[in-house]
């Protein structure tokens, strides 16, 4: 085929970009270096059980609007279960069970109401939640783009009398003056927002929470699990900037924005394989095992795969930050700033331990384990509608444990499961599989280099990926947002 656009990388970013272009009748060729699609969000077959196992447990939120748009496009949105209201069961380190259940109220009142009735908290903790409630309500407004505006133009009509004309002129002058004042106010808002963001970049999530009067108990049970799950970094390390952006997204106007959404299929069945079918049905093509290199010596992106030249009107490079240098081995001067930033970007790992038991140990889809190394446990077969015995335990921001041996991690996971779930103490663990993603996400610690934009200095070359500057952390939604934005930018080239 002679593609209009080449997409390099077949994760959420690359496939969402490719499918969005195919939807607009653009011929797309997707190149993936690995033998399978999905990038860092994929699945493999466990040789002992024959089951498809995700390379990490991925949880979404109800506010992942562009992700759901992508899944609707490829016909798999029904394979995600979205809670009607945010409900989270937890078992703390003392073995106490509790449930956070948020009623259907306008956001963030639903969260405050849920916290106020959460039996795991004391009144001091609940009062602390009220104190931060106002800050949460202000977050979305603060983070909206503050645009500079010019004076409002006035459409003049034919005034039949001088009095009416004078009145119209006075109204126009007032409109002009108010427009200038509004522009100054918005400019001031922009400057205040910039200053606030700069301050947040130097403050950790824990420091920000303490500054808003949050108690240790509330931090451990609510804010730390949310922050670590979203940012994949301990709250003593992660900068508050991205966490505040997460609050703006999760606690938007729709109370279901904060609801958890669980895939009901392995990740390759959820999006990778359906996206491939979608592309091929629309005249596109997907190649795996295709190691692509880009040469921009002629001020345009020229793609090579194993010595085979490929030409297209535009190229989207949707590889992770740590793989960018491999795609541009000649290190073009026009991309030196982006390549330097990518090379200096640190990574944060995730460890997932899959355990199989000889009997049912829980009837719940997922349970939070605050204060433990394994922060969440998911019953995979309950999620997939089968008999339960396969648990997936997740440790996000796992720099402190990623270097342990497989057996040490399995022993740790078994200990924490049995500590939290008494039924598991009499169950026999029949198999354990450890999945390490050492570079699961980019770091959001203070001092990281700036994230690049979709556009590059090279005409016809665009970037996509969860590490692109979307304002979101390294999430599925961040990847899809970048893919859709890249597709929109490409349409200006291929129209």
Describe each model-derived feature in a short phrase:
Residues 68, 72-73, 78-240, 244:
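Mobile amphipathic helical/loop "lid" adjacent to a hydrophobic cofactor/ligand pocket
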Residues 22-47:
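Glycine-rich FAD pyrophosphate-binding loop
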Residues 101-103, 362-363, 367-495:
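Conserved flavin/dinucleotide-binding core of flavoenzymes
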Residues 246-302, 310-314, 318:
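Helical element adjacent to the flavin cofactor pocket in flavoenzyme catalytic cores
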Residues 48-82:
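Conserved FAD-binding subdomain of flavin-dependent enzymes
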Residues 3-30:
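N-terminal Rossmann-like FAD-binding beta1-loop-alpha1 element of flavoenzymes
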Residues 59-63, 196-201, 212, 254-278, ...:
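Short beta-strand to alpha-helix junction loop
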Residues 86, 290-421, 451:
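Mid-domain catalytic core of redox enzymes
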């Amino acid at each position: 085929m002679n593609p209009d656009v080449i997409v390099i990388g077949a994760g959420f970013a690359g496939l969402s970009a490719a499918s969005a272009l195919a939807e607009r009748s653009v011929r797309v060729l997707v190149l993936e270096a690995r033998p399978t699609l999905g990038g860092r969000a994929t699945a493999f077959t466990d040789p002992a059980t024959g089951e498809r196992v995700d390379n990490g447990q991925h949880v979404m939120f109800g506010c992942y609007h562009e992700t759901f748009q992508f899944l609707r496009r490829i016909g798999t949105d029904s394979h995600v279960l979205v809670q009607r209201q945010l409900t989270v069961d937890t078992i703390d380190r003392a073995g106490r069970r509790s449930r956070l259940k948020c009623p259907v109220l306008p956001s963030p009142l639903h969260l405050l109401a849920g916290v106020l009735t959460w039996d795991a908290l004391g009144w001091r903790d609940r009062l602390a939640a009220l104190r931060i409630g106002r800050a949460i309500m202000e977050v979305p407004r603060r983070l909206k783009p503050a645009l500079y505006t010019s004076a409002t133009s006035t459409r003049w009509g034919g005034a039949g009398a001088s009095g009416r004309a004078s009145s119209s002129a006075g109204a126009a002058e007032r409109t002009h003056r108010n427009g200038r004042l509004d522009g100054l106010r918005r400019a001031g808002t922009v400057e205040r927002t910039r200053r606030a963001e700069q301050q947040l970049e130097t403050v950790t999530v824990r420091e920000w929470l303490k500054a808003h009067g949050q108690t240790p108990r509330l931090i451990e049970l609510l804010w730390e699990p949310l922050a670590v799950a979203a940012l994949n970094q301990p709250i003593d390390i992660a900068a508050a900037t991205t966490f505040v952006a997460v609050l703006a997204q999760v606690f938007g106007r729709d109370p279901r924005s904060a609801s958890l959404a669980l895939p009901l299929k392995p990740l390759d069945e959820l999006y990778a394989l359906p996206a491939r079918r979608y592309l091929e049905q629309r005249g596109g093509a997907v190649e795996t095992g295709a190691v692509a290199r880009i040469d921009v010596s002629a001020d345009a992106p020229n793609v090579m795969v194993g010595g085979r030249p490929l030409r297209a009107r535009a190229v989207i490079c949707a590889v992770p930050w740590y793989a960018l240098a491999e795609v541009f081995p000649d290190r073009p001067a026009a991309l030196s700033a982006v390549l330097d930033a990518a090379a200096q970007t640190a990574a944060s790992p995730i460890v997932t331990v899959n355990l199989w038991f000889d009997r049912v140990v829980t009837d719940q889809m997922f349970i939070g384990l605050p204060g433990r190394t394994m922060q969440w446990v998911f019953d995979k077969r309950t999620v997939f509608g089968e008999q339960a015995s396969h648990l997936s335990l997740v440790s996000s921001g796992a720099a402190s444990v990623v270097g342990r041996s497989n057996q040490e991690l399995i022993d740790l996971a078994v200990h924490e499961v049995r500590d939290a779930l008494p039924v598991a103490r009499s169950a026999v663990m029949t198999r354990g599989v450890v999945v390490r993603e050492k570079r699961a996400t980019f770091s959001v610690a203070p001092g990281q280099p700036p994230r690049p934009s979709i556009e590059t200095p090279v005409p016809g070359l665009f970037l996509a990926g969860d590490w692109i500057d979307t304002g979101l952390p390294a999430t599925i939604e961040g990847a899809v947002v970048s893919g859709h934005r890249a597709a929109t930018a490409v349409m200006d080239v291929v129209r």
